[in-house]
Amino acid sequence: MMNYATIVTILLLLLSGQSVNSQESPPELTPVTPIAIEQGYLEGRGLTRVDPSEFDGENVTRDEDFTSDSYTHAFYTGKIFVAVYEAGPGRVYIDGALYDEFVHILEGRLILTPDSGDAVEFKQGESLVVPQGYKGYWYMPEKYRELIVINTDYAKAEGGP
């Protein structure tokens, strides 16, 4: 005859969806390891040229005088996207940023002029957050490089990874 503790254990296992006599081994756990942010990329070495069409559909319009190439290196893509981005002088208009973006300026200056206010300048070594929905100009008056962290929830909402 089973005792009360055995009956309760069996009921709990049944309610949790596990087999009482399960011979299944536990699922394999994928090891989680840190990802190094390599200094060379932060300094602009080894970056890959960006195809300008990658910005299609991101509510970004380049000014006609923005002809310089852009370069990048992605460190990580998951719930966040972490990358270095570099461009020459230029200005773009953002008509409603699709995602929250953390920016740390590695080289150059960034001048943001929101539709709703005055220009704000950020310099090398400074950090900022551009919230989802931002509308305004993004101006890089000289060679510019940044470390960015982007929330990738927007891509999932649009059927992305």
What is the predicted role of each segment?
Residues 117-132:
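Short acidic-glycine-tyrosine-enriched beta hairpin
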Residues 97-112:
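Short, conserved beta-strand element in jelly-roll/cupin
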Residues 7-16:
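Bacterial N-terminal signal peptides
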Residues 82, 94, 112, 146-149:
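Short hydrophobic/aromatic-rich beta-strand segments that constitute the beta-sheet cores
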Residues 1-6:
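Positively charged n-region of N-terminal signal peptides that target proteins for export
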